[in-house]
Amino acid sequence: MKERYGTVYKGSQRLIDEESGEVIEVDKLYRKQTSGNFVKAYIVQLISMLDMIGGKKLKIVNYILDNVHLSNNTMIATTREIAKATGTSLQTVITTLKILEEGNIIKRKTGVLMLNPELLMRGDDQKQKYLLLEFGNFEQEANEID
């Protein structure tokens, strides 16, 4: 993983070369580490989500977490496909997805769901801002379709 640094200017300073006695003016720059490209799991939100769900519903949540595309936090699957893949009933999938929607954990359109980037995402702060905008617009787009 490549770390990223932001350069911060802290002014200038005069130094004296011990050998020559020459006065040298230098700029003081510091590097501040910023978020790199990694997967963030926000534990508080993850735990609160798991508290809302139990049993077979947890199987569905794990399936979503395992199959979401971290490039855009989406998963393309119908409720029937999720039910078949997890060995749960269609009604359990529908109920679980409704709970996740009401908890602002996912947003859905026909055949596609998007996971809230405050819960899980891969990328830096800029990517999170972008995904949060997409997450906000996801529901709006879904409402325009309906």
Curated annotation (Swiss-Prot):
The protein, known as: Replication and maintenance protein
InterPro entries found in the cross-reference section: HTH_CRP (IPR012318), Plasmid_replication_RepL (IPR008813), WH-like_DNA-bd_sf (IPR036388), WH_DNA-bd_sf (IPR036390)
GO BP term (any one): regulation of DNA-templated transcription
Any one GO molecular-function label of the UniProt entry: DNA binding
Pfam entry (one): RepL
Source organism: Bacillus subtilis
Alphabetized Gene3D superfamilies for the sequence: Winged helix-like DNA-binding domain superfamily/Winged helix DNA-binding domain
Keywords: DNA replication, Plasmid
